[in-house]
Amino acid sequence: LLSAREFDLVITMARVGEMDVKAFGTEAKLVIEGLPVVMLSHNTRELATLSAGDGIDRIFVWTGDSRILLSICKLIEDERNVENDVRDGDVQVILLVEDSRRFYSAYLPLLYTQLVNQTTRLMGEGGNLHEKLLRLRARAKILLASDMNSAKSVIDRYHNNIIGIFTDGKFPNQGGQRDTAGLELVRYAQEGHRYMPILFQSKNLELK
């Protein structure tokens, strides 16, 4: 199939016949250069042993909510289009910083649903179908970062267009403390943008 036609995204389960899923992802990327390959799993044991990389771009958890499929498509679309849309259309950006696969797999469908509903309400009844589609495409883009370096990279690149940051209290922090990574990121984001809206989420009461 990959050789016969063009694909924009591959979503695969952890088991692809007898082939290892990472080997499958690598093979797919050899057929179509730059093809995003996302793995979807519901097996807790599998999730504990698998990591992104080597053919797999992201890993999501299947919880029974079918909206995760649309959210994966929208996230990959946002990641691919954000640079051009910010440059050409001054589109806004929302940053989600979370390394828990189970949490961001549950969070993203909620976030995208609210974002699309709000955009639809703002459009109202006016305008033709073409105008409404253009407005939907101009909705805020959501970017997912799972460690400190990638979060800072998004802030550095799109700080003028970020309208909000949702951050966990703990996540991988290269060269720093994992337990206080969220607070470090908040300080970093507000250094040049004091009033940037940030929602800090943590189960650790000591960080509140």
Model-predicted segments: where are they?
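Conserved phosphotransfer microenvironments
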Residues: 1, 6-37, 41-49, 56, ...
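In a subset of proteins, long, contiguous C-terminal domains/tails are tracked
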Residues: 199-200, 208
